[in-house]
Amino acid sequence: MGLRPWMTRAHAPFLLATFLCAAAPLLADEPLFDLKPIAEGVYAAIARPKFILNCNALVVVLEDGVLVVDTHSKPSAAKGLIDQIKTVTDKPVRYVVNTHFHWDHNQGNAAYLSAWPGGVEVISSEATAESVEQRGIPRIEHEIATRPKEIERLRTEASAAKDPVARLKLEGQLKETEAYVAELKNMQMKLPTMTFDHNLVLRRGPRTVLMLVLGKAHTDGDVFVFLPKEKVLASGDALQGWMPYMADGHPYDWIRTLEDAQKLDFDMTVGGHGDVLRGKGQFELWKSYLRDLMAETAKAYAGGASLDEARTRVADALATRYESRFSAAGLPAESFRPSLTGNIEKAYRVVSGQQD
């Protein structure tokens, strides 16, 4: 099976958004996450910016243990969150949910199974489990094979850097990338152990957790995790604090899926990246953006525009409408155009019939 665009170049703007958010490199002993209480026994673990991307997590304390939504880019990151979880509860993690198959949301699964052998269920949609096995595992092999080139680039740039701040930054990136590759070489990917197609309900004491597949969106198997009593939603990357990342997305379905998710009664959303979202304004922003992106791209294609021409036309049309709105939502201004370009390429493939 061939490698897909999300594995390499197409993820670059999304990674850029993460890195540009960092004001300074984290010290080795600093936590990787800000663990924010958002309801009684419910925490948003907001990932601090790192060169090797981590996702956010939702931590839910249940009667018989803890449920965690998403496990980040590597076991060591998940281990870091496990240590932070132990500061707020002595209950074991019993359930881990993978919202979708992308690497930065599930490569830490093994840390939970190591911490509590035989006592953790890894839950996902059936579509996500299949994609983790068929695409996620080959991606790990691809990373091990290709990251050394990045390591050499970083080493060269760090050696040549004359500015001490720039050199320190590059040396930090180099160290982080070397550690990541070493960890991948020794990592055994742990696949979901429990899957479902439409919804799964977990009732533990007074807490009810709904796991919902509402339709195609960011991928073909996105899971929303909903706490009806607490009015909290975890959305993975189907809705997060920056721009949509569309390489594996289904834009027309995505709009409908967001509409269905929006009908749920929630006050807060913990997306895969960015800060906790209050209200439903981000849903409206994303739906509007997706509609306009597809309409402008379809218009350009119908007018005979090539992909290169569409990139320029659609970017110019959407920049005036959305650059300031996404910047206000937390996306660094420097990453708006690169992120938009990748999404235009996806939209063009859809309107031209190359993809759905």
List where the protein language model places each region.
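Conserved beta-strand hairpin/beta-sheet module of binuclear metal-dependent hydrolase folds
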Residues: 36-87, 223-237
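Core dinuclear metal-dependent hydrolase active-site scaffold
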Residues: 37, 185-191, 195-227
